[in-house]
Amino acid sequence: MMSLNDPRWSSFDGAHRVPFDAAAPLTAFLSGKLSDEQFWYVVWNDLFHQDDVGVASYAAVPQIMRICEQQHLFDYNLVTFAAGVERVRHYDDNPALPAWLEAEYRAGLQAIIRYGIRHLTDEWDAATLKSFLMLVAVYKGNLGLCDLLDCVDDGDEQAAINAITNH
């Protein structure tokens, strides 16, 4: 796994298409200098914003999993961030996953899925369950099912039908 001290972090673009050194908030969260709430605010603002992601987002996935596991933190944000990043990385306006990062990124997604399975007996709200199912679907390459799951609580049956017929 790429070290949080690796100088490449500062060169990776975040969700706003500008360099964002994700190692700084990851390190701060790991050391307890950022609360859960502060950390996830940074993640949702700088690593995933309105379906935009960057290489920093991809590189952060395995690190976030490692930190959450160390802190015994399993919640909506972890699975939703991972599912969201994997889902939108296929969009044309987001950067390709660099070949040098692919194995580490995929291992991070697998680890999040395994971590979720270990927490199956925990109490989950509907949003966490939906996000976990979306993560499994998109990880397995079923973008249509992921999109369908995303429409489930919208109450828009036509959006759900469109989601599965457009893939």
Language model segments and positions:
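Intrinsically disordered, low-complexity regions enriched in Ser/Pro/Gly/Gln/His and often acidic
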Residues: 1-2, 117
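Alpha-helical solenoid scaffolds in large eukaryotic transport, assembly, and signaling factors
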Residues: 3-69, 75-104
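General structural signal for secondary-structure boundaries
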Residues: 71, 75, 123-126
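Long, helix-rich interaction regions
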Residues: 87-167
